[in-house]
Amino acid sequence: MGWDSPSARLPMLLLLLAAPLSFDMKEIDTKLGVGYAVLIADVDGDKKPDIIVADTDRVVWYQNPTWKKRTIIQGKTKRDNVCIAAHDIDGDGRLDLALGADWRVPFDTSKGGTLQWLRQPKDPDKEWDVFPIGEEPTMHRIRWADLRGDGTMSLVSGPLMGRDSTAKGNWEDGRPLRLQAWAIPKDPTKPWKAETLDESLRVMHNFAAVPSSSGKGSDLLTASCLGVHRLSLADGKWRLKHVGTGDQSKPKGRRGASEIKQGRLKDGSAFIATIEPWHGDSVVVYTPDKAGGLWTRAVIDDKLRWGHAVWCADLDGDGEDEVVIGVRDNLSREDRGGVRIYKRDGDGWARQLLDAGGVAVEDLAVADLDGDGKPDIVAVGRATKNVRIYRNTGKK
């Protein structure tokens, strides 16, 4: 679990070793189907964060601190379940879930892709009720966000691809994909209405809600084949600004960016961490351009295969965020799938291999699970079919 330098030729990697963070690993499940998405939220209202996983044909949760597994739903949606987001949708004081399902492989860009919400019952051992929200082919990622800065949460949904896109056309020959926001109706069991925020991107693997540049509510950062963009509300209209190029080395292949999160440096300035290109092999950090142009792009690791998750969090309490990366596949015996942490020191970044080969990361999340003030990491594995908790014990 020591810090190392993935590649001396990469411009922002430190060659000096740094003090590694210490984690205790606990495996709480080894029988997932795929484990498409993991979420940390307080399901039962006891002020302790629980773990929620969207699996192939079910949604389950693990109760903190025993990690007893309970089934939320099974077989109530069109498989596969692919994305999940938590919010008290009906206002009864209990946490509910939005769920994207009917994920199809091979990709079907003309039909499929359902969006629904799950209402939590009073009895935690009963399955939850399912209510439809909408449909969009290749429904892939969802997030709750306060888009207008008035405290009202909307469900933002993004498909992977635009309608009628084809493999022959590099999934870019159909209509642009629709990034939509769904307002909760007065009676959420009734039909929901969607607002299209943007319809210009192609192959958007993920997006993140971040503090708005106006100081109220949230903007959206997108990772697509066109690179990194910021979607902001200005004068009542949603405007898309190009922030980063992404990896454009293969214009007819997988390109752009894939996973995305925003972090903070010690001076308070933001940085953006991505996996590039789509399902890519590089960890990239963007920092703002002083002249206001495209952000400066720096590859900090290129020794991975199929990066599939990113998070930014201050793991060591020094006032600056680290980057946590989940890797799905093995590149070599030395560079395996798992969980990696990147820490900034001066002008460089150093890498810590937290778990090399023990979890083929499909998704990960970071939050303080035990109330000790230190963020912990939860990762779910696709090929490994497991859920692992990495409890942050601090520096060695």
Segment roles from a protein language model:
Residues L10-A19:
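Sec-dependent N-terminal signal peptides
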